[in-house]
């Protein structure tokens, strides 16, 4: 068993929204690792970061991603930072991985000052998002077999393009 597709991308790229719509369009189940982490921990991601720190969160996330990649047959939406894990990047090899690309400006517009996103909280949001993208963009590109820009495109249009690409 393997997922039909795995979505990756930075905060605000549309992983959850596109994931839901793509799963619906393909009549497949969706597995959102951020939701699964919160369900497993019984707390929000922000609470895990505050109470246990990023390393504890990443360890839990890595295990949930592993289970999803090994057993879920639908669409899997990964948390934005999951690709920081070398183990996760290894697990993604051989799978259809869709990188939802977004500009820093659009990402900031979509995420704003969302405190549910602990790595973007506090300080200068533009600087934090730019630095996050500087670190992660090469990793997203490394794991991606399909890249699609989401800037200025409706979720419906992005899903339409992805359905066509997945049918190729």
Curated annotation (Swiss-Prot):
E.C. numbers: 2.7.1.71
GO BP annotations, alphabetical order: amino acid biosynthetic process; aromatic amino acid family biosynthetic process; chorismate biosynthetic process
Keywords: Amino-acid biosynthesis, Aromatic amino acid biosynthesis, ATP-binding, Cytoplasm, Kinase, Magnesium, Metal-binding, Nucleotide-binding, Transferase
TM stretches of this protein: none
Keyword Transport listed: no
Cellular location(s): Cytoplasm
Database matches in SUPFAM superfamilies: P-loop containing nucleoside triphosphate hydrolases (SSF52540)
Function per UniProt: Catalyzes the specific phosphorylation of the 3-hydroxyl group of shikimic acid using ATP as a cosubstrate.
Complexes and interactors: Monomer.
Protein name: Shikimate kinase
Naturally occurring in which organism (per UniProt): Rhodococcus jostii (strain RHA1)
């Amino acid at each position: 068993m393997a997922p039909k597709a795995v979505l990756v991308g930075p905060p605000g790229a549309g992983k959850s929204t596109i994931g839901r719509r793509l799963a619906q369009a393909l009549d497949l189940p969706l597995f959102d690792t951020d939701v699964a982490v919160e369900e497993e921990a019984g707390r929000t991601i922000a609470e895990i970061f505050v109470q246990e720190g990023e390393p504890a969160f990443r360890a839990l996330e890595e295990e949930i991603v592993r289970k999803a990649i090994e057993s879920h047959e639908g669409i899997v939406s990964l948390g934005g930072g999951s690709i920081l894990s070398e183990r996760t990047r290894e697990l993604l090899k051989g799978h259809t991985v869709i990188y939802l690309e977004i500009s820093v400006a659009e990402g900031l517009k979509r995420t704003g000052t969302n405190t549910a996103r602990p790595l973007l909280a506090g300080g200068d949001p533009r600087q934090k998002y730019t630095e996050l993208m500087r670190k992660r963009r090469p990793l997203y590109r490394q794991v991606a077999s399909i890249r699609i820009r989401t800037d200025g495109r409706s979720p419906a249009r992005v899903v339409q393009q992805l359905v066509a690409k997945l049918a190729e």
